[in-house]
Amino acid sequence: MEVMNLIEQPIKVTEWQQTYTYDSGIHSGANTCVPSLSSKGLIEEDEACGRQYTLKKTTTYTQSVPPGQGDLEYQMSTTARAKRVREAMCPGVTGEDSSLLLTTQVEGQTTNLQRLAEPSQLLKSAIVHLINYQDDAELATRALPELTKLLNDEDPVVVTKAAMIVNQLSKKEASRRALMGSPQLVAAVVRTMQNTSDLDTARCTTSILHNLSHHREGLLAIFKSGGIPALVRMLSSPVESVLFYAITTLHNLLLYQEGAKMAVRLADGLQKMVPLLNKNNPKFLAITTDCLQLLAYGNQESKLIILANGGPQALVQIMRNYSYEKLLWTTSRVLKVLSVCPSNKPAIVEAGGMQALGKHLTSNSPRLVQNCLWTLRNLSDVATKQEGLESVLKILVNQLSVDDVNVLTCATGTLSNLTCNNSKNKTLVTQNSGVEALIHAILRAGDKDDITEPAVCALRHLTSRHPEAEMAQNSVRLNYGIPAIVKLLNQPNQWPLVKATIGLIRNLALCPANHAPLQEAAVIPRLVQLLVKAHQDAQRHVAAGTQQPYTDGVRMEEIVEGCTGALHILARDPMNRMEIFRLNTIPLFVQLLYSSVENIQRVAAGVLCELAQDKEAADAIDAEGASAPLMELLHSRNEGTATYAAAVLFRISEDKNPDYRKRVSVELTNSLFKHDPAAWEAAQSMIPMNEPYADDMDATYRPMYSSDVPMDPLEMHMDMDGDYPIDTYSDGLRPPYATADHMLA
């Protein structure tokens, strides 16, 4: 019997768009049909592969044929045997309609007899399927050597017909398993696919590998046969069905075959995949983008290749133009991975990535919303100057009302960055109840520093240097935020949170109405306690001659500067001045005048300038020997430091004898005010005490601290984003949860 007659007519493939599951078929084992990549229709493979061809050559297999019989006779006897088994076990079963019962039936109703007969009919059907399965396996096994030989034939017509036959065999489970067990045949299919220029042959061979890739044994056979470079080559095919088969097969390999990712990278698979993002079939794009995510995750070189081939722009376009949830989710996963790459981040933002991601923050898909939030969080430190983020900011403020930890972490972090040195964004968030929402988030966060610390930083930004800053300062008090904020100064809170809280308290103190609530919350003793502890730690390292290390990413000198600066602003209130003086802080402030850190010298001179308004404090300052370091600071390059020093010297000299006052006056005039008479008047009236700190008067360090970010528990290939630095003491950026995606690669 001819080889072609060993198989039945092909079974029509279920349309892929209706039955597509995200495993590309490997879990269900269901074969799929090729979608149109242009969304214009389907190519029915049955039209190409459903015709039968007669081959003039047969092969005899002596090892499995009874002595004295030819292959044809043995096949006939096997067929007859199967027929006899059917007739013996299931009499009357002869074809597709054999399951119908010969009984009278009222149209639209099932008779009692039919219902009683259902179990026996099911048993009969199962037996028939079992017989057919065995037949398929036996026939495919006997045909494999001949088909392998035909695939290697020099005649392209013969090769095409052989590929069609193997394709039909690969659609049935029994024969497909037989094909997977033949490395020679799989290698022949791969070789044929790689070398052919015939479109029908290319379609059939890619279809074969696609069907085999539904099983782990098939994936291994494809991988060992060098199928990955051949499949990557097929990504350049003009035939849409070939593209579909190639990308889904590669997707299954990337998911489940060890070593496939490296093989795809070495075959320049990324360079071929990124241009496919310009196709317009959503389900094809979903598989393509997931391939990109699998390849880019944990591999910096892959991220740069995607960038070089225009990937960020194409991905942002998908987020902007499509509504298919699975595509949006897979695309957001790629952007999430790319958002921790310093080179990709600006490209995504410049392509409109912030706005495109913001569109989906109100989606009904929690997994899509979460990916968009993480990506926005990671991109936000390079998006502080972006326009058109009004709707994103409003949504982020609304997201602060939810209880999900990941949502709160992302929303607070993004708001912290987007309000950094951006007066427009600060005003918008303040006007949309952002202060109230942030305070409530802090109250609900408990001990979760990943939420509390960026929320405090955002409040710090909102309470300074924009038209609504005073409104924000008052809003913190009116929403009962001051007691909760002051409590954050307590140890054992992490130093980054303590540092951010100190900065917020300094800004709140700029509002006179906040002085009494701050004093009632015992903020001054806590600040002094932190100041003493931090200064002692810093001095120990100075005495030992060692460089001061970071504690949780914060240097103790930053805490010294922050506490002193906050006390400087609080000292504007007479009651606060008295409390600060009674805590015996003047010796420490005088000692800080000798600091090698210019910013610490400035804030120390500033707080002494405030305290010197009271005669008792001025005398104490003079008694501590402050005149000498203050005279030195008159020559400081920092104009603010010199002005504060002059004001203190002028105040403590008021009760001195005329000769001393004259000497101080001459020194002040010669060193500081020689060319600026107005500055002398300013020092006399201590004008600087009425002005808030400007940005350039804050510290410029940008330390880091580690924070584990929850993994994305979706699918078996997850990505995790890792550490992020806190912002500066003033308005500072919070770079992304950066380079930890290698941890799960």
Swiss-Prot record:
SUPFAM superfamilies: ARM repeat (SSF48371). GO terms for molecular function: alpha-catenin binding; cadherin binding; cytoskeletal protein-membrane anchor activity; nuclear receptor binding; protein homodimerization activity; protein phosphatase binding; transcription coactivator activity. The modification Phosphoserine is found at S99, S125, S182, S665, S730. One of its GO terms (cellular component) is cytoplasm. Residues 574-661 are annotated as: Interaction with DSC1. The modification N-acetylmethionine is found at M1. It holds the Pfam family Arm. Residues 132-297 are annotated as: Interaction with DSC1 and DSG1. Its main location: other. It is found in: Cell junction, Adherens junction; Cell junction, Desmosome; Cytoplasm, Cytoskeleton; Cell membrane. ARM repeats lie at residues 132-171, 172-215, 216-255, 258-297, 298-341, 342-381, 383-420, 423-464, 470-510, 512-551, 574-613, 615-661. It comes from the Eukaryota. Keywords: Acetylation, Cell adhesion, Cell junction, Cell membrane, Cytoplasm, Cytoskeleton, Glycoprotein, Membrane, Nucleus, Phosphoprotein, Repeat. One of its GO terms (biological process) is protein localization to plasma membrane. Glycans are attached at T14. It is a peripheral membrane protein. May be phosphorylated by FER. Common junctional plaque protein. The membrane-associated plaques are architectural elements in an important strategic position to influence the arrangement and function of both the cytoskeleton and the cells within the tissue. The presence of plakoglobin in both the desmosomes and in the intermediate junctions suggests that it plays a central role in the structure and function of submembranous plaques. Acts as a substrate for VE-PTP and is required by it to stimulate VE-cadherin function in endothelial cells. Belongs to the beta-catenin family. Homodimer. Component of an E-cadherin/catenin adhesion complex composed of at least E-cadherin/CDH1 and gamma-catenin/JUP, and possibly alpha-catenin/CTNNA1; the complex is located to adherens junctions. The stable association of CTNNA1 is controversial as CTNNA1 was shown not to bind to F-actin when assembled in the complex. Interacts with MUC1. Interacts with CAV1. Interacts with PTPRJ. Interacts with DSG1. Interacts with DSC1 and DSC2. Interacts with PKP2. Interacts with PKP3 (via N-terminus); the interaction is required for PKP3 localization to desmosome cell-cell junctions. The entire ARM repeats region mediates binding to CDH1/E-cadherin. The N-terminus and first three ARM repeats are sufficient for binding to DSG1. The N-terminus and first ARM repeat are sufficient for association with CTNNA1. DSC1 association requires both ends of the ARM repeat region. This is Junction plakoglobin.
